């Protein structure tokens, strides 16, 4: 090689790699930004209702908060996890250009979730008796039970909504979901004002507003799917095929539900445990602040995890294992950057954050001391969300469920209880247990991802969605 002559092949390969990385970053951000908005907007519906109830007095506020938490643990979380199976099935089918299968999978998921909603609604109908059974105050249990009953229609709508969301997300069609969520949130504010403050329904009106809003969102998105040209190949109408292969769907859906529930239940469990600590009012108040802060920030991570799932499932379904691998590296990098920003912001506002929730100086000071632990947990939670998204994109729900079981219930929760009660660290000890669980979860999922044979995963995706000769609804 002569002096002064640059090897053109090396430059071309390097430039090509950088171009691919930049393109992948653009795709990830284009997907994740609307998904973050969707997560925040849909999460805000229940928060807005509780805020309106707060103007009615301390008893309705306490009851609505407990009913909302109970509804999340016994209903919404389970349906959310079950619907997440579509991230694997629809995402890989779309990548394989088997567009007709997306509509079939969505109908199948809707059928399963509607069936599951029936026993869950029976649980909600008996909320008062269940709360009394676990020694909640009877007056609070009575109001919470009534609140939960008015939320029962929202349970069925929520399951359908999650199915439609994932059907559209799998097609990279995320902006309509964001727009419909925004319209629904605006309507919800109006409904809460009308039902809670103007019609005399009181706290019941707040619960009813949730039900109406979720159904309104379902109708909006259903109309979009029905009439939009972008869904003309993936939605071809109702089909009897949806009632077939239910067992195959459940093999992914059940572990997917377990994967989500095990994680979210552990947070609620430790907040409940804080009520058994010395000075339970202080501990419970501060842990609730930490939980609400973490849940709000978690919505950002959920959006990133959704983008990871879409990109990985699409590329594996399309038979592009190396592009899927690149997508993983890019989204992890984005999650690290997001985590650094979150930690920086939380630490900078740690002394004033408590004022948003309370005027009690003890609660404010205690919350400030907890923020560094919470910030560490949020950083790790961002990583686990994108790694869990990768797991859903690959169809690793069983692995994810096992990892979450071990991380939270064999390590995190026992350690948190040990630190909180035996070593008398209190709420800090409980939250340190969560941080430890997240650390183990991130480590395990990272190892699984690092040692993945992506060529093999692409073949699995091809087998899962079916032969390319069966491209019903394919568009060339």
Curated annotation (Swiss-Prot):
GO CC terms in record: membrane
UniProt-listed InterPro entries: MATE_euk, MATE_fam
Membrane topology: Multi-pass membrane protein
Annotated GO MF terms: antiporter activity; xenobiotic transmembrane transporter activity
Subcellular localization: Membrane
TM annotation in the entry: 29-51, 70-90, 111-131, 140-160, 177-197, 205-225, 252-272, 286-306, 326-346, 363-383, 405-425, 431-451
One example of a Gene Ontology biological process annotation: xenobiotic detoxification by transmembrane export across the plasma membrane
Coiled-coil ranges per UniProt: none
Tagged with keyword Kinase: no
Major localisation: membrane
UniProt KW Methyltransferase keyword: no
Protein name per UniProt: Protein DETOXIFICATION 17
Provenance organism: Arabidopsis thaliana
The gene coding this protein: DTX17
């Amino acid at each position: 090689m002569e002096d002064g002559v640059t090897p053109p092949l090396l430059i071309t390969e390097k430039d090509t790699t950088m171009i691919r990385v930049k393109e992948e970053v653009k795709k990830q951000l284009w997907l994740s930004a609307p998904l973050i908005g969707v997560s925040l907007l849909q999460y805000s519906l229940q928060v807005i209702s509780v805020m309106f109830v707060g103007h009615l007095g301390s008893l309705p506020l306490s009851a609505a908060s407990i009913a909302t938490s109970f509804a999340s643990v016994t209903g919404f979380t389970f349906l959310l996890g079950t619907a997440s199976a579509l991230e694997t099935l629809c995402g890989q089918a779309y990548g394989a250009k088997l567009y007709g299968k997306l509509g079939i999978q969505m109908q199948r998921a809707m059928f399963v979730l509607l069936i599951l909603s029936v026993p869950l609604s029976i649980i909600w109908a008996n909320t008062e008796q269940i709360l009394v059974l676990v020694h909640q105050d009877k007056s609070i249990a009575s109001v919470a039970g009534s609140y939960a009953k008015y939320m029962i229609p929202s349970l069925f709508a929520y399951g359908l909504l999650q199915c439609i969301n994932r059907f559209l997300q799998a097609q990279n069609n995320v902006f309509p979901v964001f727009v419909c969520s925004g319209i629904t949130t605006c309507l919800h504010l109006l409904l809460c004002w009308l039902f809670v403050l103007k019609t005399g329904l009181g706290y019941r009106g707040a619960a009813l507003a949730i039900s109406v809003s979720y159904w309104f969102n379902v109708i909006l998105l259903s109309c979009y799917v029905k009439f939009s040209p972008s869904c003309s190949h993936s939605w071809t109408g109702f089909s009897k095929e949806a009632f077939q292969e239910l067992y195959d769907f459940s093999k992914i859906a059940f572990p997917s539900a377990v994967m989500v529930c095990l994680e979210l239940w552990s947070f609620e469990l430790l907040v409940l445990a804080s009520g058994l600590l010395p000075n339970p009012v202080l501990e419970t108040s501060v842990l609730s602040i930490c939980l609400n802060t973490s849940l709000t920030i978690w919505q950002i991570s959920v959006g990133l995890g959704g983008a990871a799932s879409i990109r990985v499932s699409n590329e594996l379904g399309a038979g592009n294992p190396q592009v899927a691998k690149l997508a993983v590296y890019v989204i992890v990098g984005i999650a690290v950057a997001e985590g650094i920003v979150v930690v920086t912001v939380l630490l900078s506002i740690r002394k004033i954050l408590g004022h948003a929730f309370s005027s009690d100086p003890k609660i404010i000071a205690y919350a400030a001391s907890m923020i560094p632990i919470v910030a560490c947990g949020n950083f790790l939670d961002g990583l686990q969300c994108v790694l869990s998204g990768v797991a859903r994109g690959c169809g690793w729900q069983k692995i994810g469920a096992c990892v979450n079981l071990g991380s939270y219930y064999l390590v995190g929760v026992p350690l948190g209880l040990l630190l909180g009660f035996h070593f008398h660290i209190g709420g800090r000890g409980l939250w340190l247990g969560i941080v430890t669980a997240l650390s183990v979860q991130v480590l395990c999922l990272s190892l699984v991802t690092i040692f993945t044979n992506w060529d093999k995963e692409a073949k699995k995706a091809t087998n899962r969605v079916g032969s390319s000769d069966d491209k019903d609804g394919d568009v060339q």
